[in-house]
């Protein structure tokens, strides 16, 4: 993974390259610090992105306090989806919607620079965006987020199964 991030960094003159921390690479503060610092030091990334909510806040805070810029990721979390049985949109039920809002607030309090919100109902993504003071980046979460991302394999339809609805036709 470091090799791929380094290649992107070498090919970019001005973009902020954010390394997506692999699943299980940040299970505790020690592992997170070792792996995140490698992305920054060895690959040249400008920040790391980590999936998870309030349960990740202590690890996120420790990284940020050590100088590692972190982007959060809540809602559908693709790296852990199969392992954690979260293969669908998140936040449709009141309890999970409330938890996602709490997750976003906890990550903001921990110091993340922005939060990716993926496959969350439009109204919930709008509420989260309104409640935060940091940018939100939506993936299939409606137009109310601060910015949007489209995933190239989704747009091209090159994965098995149907393309996500938010990818368009």
Q: Where are the predicted features?
A:
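Alpha/beta enzyme core
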Residues: 1-167
């Amino acid at each position: 993974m470091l090799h791929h991030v380094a290649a992107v960094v070498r090919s970019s003159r001005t973009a902020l390259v954010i390394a997506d921390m692999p699943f299980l690479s940040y299970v505790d503060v020690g592992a997170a610090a070792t792996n995140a610092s490698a992305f920054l030091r060895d690959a040249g990334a400008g920040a790391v992105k980590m999936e998870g909510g309030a349960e990740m806040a202590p690890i996120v805070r420790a990284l940020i306090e050590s100088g590692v810029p972190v982007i959060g990721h809540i809602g559908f979390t693709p790296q852990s989806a199969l392992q954690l049985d979260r293969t669908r949109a998140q936040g449709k039920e009141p309890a999970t919607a409330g938890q996602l809002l709490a997750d976003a607030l906890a990550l903001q309090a921990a110091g993340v620079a922005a939060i990716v919100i993926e496959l969350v109902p439009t109204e919930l993504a709008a509420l989260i965006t309104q409640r935060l003071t940091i940018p939100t980046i939506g993936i299939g979460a409606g137009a109310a987020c601060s910015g949007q991302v489209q995933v190239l394999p989704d747009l091209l339809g090159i994965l098995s199964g149907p393309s996500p609805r938010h990818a368009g036709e």
